[in-house]
Amino acid sequence: MLLDEIKRMSYDELKRLAEDIRKRITEVVLKNGGHLASNLGTIELTLALYRVFDPREDAIIWDTGHQAYTHKILTGRDDLFHTIRTFGGLSGFVTRRESPLDWFGTGHAGTSIAAGLGFEKAFELLGEKRHVVVVIGDGALTSGMALEALNQLKNLNSKMKIILNDNGMSISPNVGGLAYHLSKLRTSPIYLKGKKVLKKVLEKTEIGFEVEEEMKYLRDSLKGMIQGTNFFESLGLKYFGPFDGHNIELLEKVFKRIRDYDYSSVVHVVTKKGKGFTAAEENPTKYHSASPSGKPKMLSYSELLGHTLSRVAREDKKIVAITAAMADGTGLSIFQKEHPDRFFDLGITEQTCVTFGAALGLHGMKPVVAIYSTFLQRAYDQIIHDVALQNAPVLFAIDRSGVVGEDGPTHHGLFDINYLLPVPNMKIISPSSPEEFVNSLYTVLKHLDGPVAIRYPKESFYGEVESLLENMKEIDLGWKILKRGREAAIIATGTILNEVLKIPLDVTVVNALTVKPLDTAVLKEIARDHDLIITVEEAMKIGGFGSFVAQRLQEMGWQGKIVNLGVEDLFVPHGGRKELLSMLGLDSEGLTKTVLTYIKARSREGKV
């Protein structure tokens, strides 16, 4: 295992290994897709860390999990690294299902410090002597959960070592007061001068030489520069740094010094996101998550959101857009360029984004809160308490709904229908096509008078933005019967409708644009004409759209058979969208087999 080999290597050998790993990560990610820039920035950091701490004994927790590719390579997964993010291959994130050295599964930002506290307390109660190390960066420290946990370190007498991987970025550039504070620390002329002095000292020392005085110089210099207590020290933590995150020898010495300290320490490490790959260094936001190379350029729903909002906002000055550190990912960077004064990136603060939007809406604005489905889960209380309870006019643009593919179970948007359905005042819209998406946005923004959620997939498509926007119009947000048949009625919501339309059977097909409220008039018509109704949704089946329809049919006194098709009670793995839909039985082939089975069964009962 490379984990053992690196401890015997010279620093020159480690530098060569770092470049080999950098080349390997770049080649694999450009082929498979994945988080490129973040991982290129943490290679030397990981090598130095694992020369001092051992993940077989010490709990090393990687926040968010997308910066841990080197960790995977070092911990016995080098031979499988080429399979990362492919169906049946390695996950793109840290997961306990993959290795016992992945101490805590991650995918969402800001969880590591709280998890570290939990492990530390468990070790203490069980009498186990282990270190707890947290590596947090890419903006995760700005999340509320991370700050809450930081505030508990002193209270719980923690000895945790926190490695702050500061690359000045999350997915987009960091924002907020803490980001500004860290920027001041790493750009101080005193720090830069101290860094040069330390480099010269290290060049003259033997490898085993203690660097106490030099470290003290840096620490005292930084304290003088700040003119008082810095943010971390105000919480009772010991702060060290900032240090060059690409200097293995320096980092190893620092980690050795703090390893056995009996108090919580923050080691501030400055890294270059995308280091070693020019394109990623120059545009780390674009290469935060790279798509597989060689694919033709297509238009995404996210980009379409940005273009649509930008166009509508030219006439409607009340439209504002809000995102949580994902301006590019959500397509709102397009809106930002045209309407910078009405764009708000609040960092990794989903809860704050929702409440911020609620207040804007209550005072006459039309806020659009664009957040990935999986991350909106983090603001559920705010959706209920701050938005829905007050009937605040907020449009939730829920990106990445449904099966998202290679990012896997931490990122699939399969719960949004289920957690939004029971919320009073909430309307839920699930368009089936780009045209329907644009027209739904336009219609909702024209008449926004309460909370509305529009959910849409990660899918891309061939299409012209101008053509879609030129034909933008208000539409009826009800259901439509697209095809009439005799053997059964299928009601589908969202883009999964496109799979349903491929079913080669004599069935009625209904496009359920609105998940809530249900179109009772169309539902009654379908119930009158059919004894077998099948619902299809790209979401969790339990408590979802199908359950809602079944409940309404029961209330109507309908005596037929209803079948709900969706995602069963499981966490969907990572893989290509087509592969996953096939696995779930939600592609056209799987749906055809299932529908035919129920038609035949109903026929044997003499009901069809």
Swiss-Prot record:
InterPro entries: Dxylulose-5-P_synthase (IPR005477), THDP-binding (IPR029061), Transketo_C/PFOR_II (IPR009014), Transketolase-like_Pyr-bd (IPR005475), Transketolase_C (IPR033248), Transketolase_CS (IPR049557). Pathway: Metabolic intermediate biosynthesis; 1-deoxy-D-xylulose 5-phosphate biosynthesis; 1-deoxy-D-xylulose 5-phosphate from D-glyceraldehyde 3-phosphate and pyruvate: step 1/1. One of its GO terms (molecular function) is magnesium ion binding. One of its GO terms (biological process) is isopentenyl diphosphate biosynthetic process, methylerythritol 4-phosphate pathway. It comes from the Bacteria. Keywords: Isoprene biosynthesis, Magnesium, Metal-binding, Thiamine biosynthesis, Thiamine pyrophosphate, Transferase. Gene3D superfamilies: 3.40.50.920, 3.40.50.970. Its EC number is 2.2.1.7. Binds 1 Mg(2+) ion per subunit. It catalyses: D-glyceraldehyde 3-phosphate + pyruvate + H(+) = 1-deoxy-D-xylulose 5-phosphate + CO2. Its cofactor is Mg(2+); thiamine diphosphate. Thiamine diphosphate binds at residues 66, 107-109, 139-140, 167, 277, 350. Pfam families: DXP_synthase_N, Transket_pyr, Transketolase_C. One of its GO terms (cellular component) is cytosol. Mg(2+) binds at residues 138, 167. HAMAP family: DXP_synth. Belongs to the transketolase family. DXPS subfamily. Catalyzes the acyloin condensation reaction between C atoms 2 and 3 of pyruvate and glyceraldehyde 3-phosphate to yield 1-deoxy-D-xylulose-5-phosphate (DXP). Homodimer. This is 1-deoxy-D-xylulose-5-phosphate synthase. The gene is dxs.
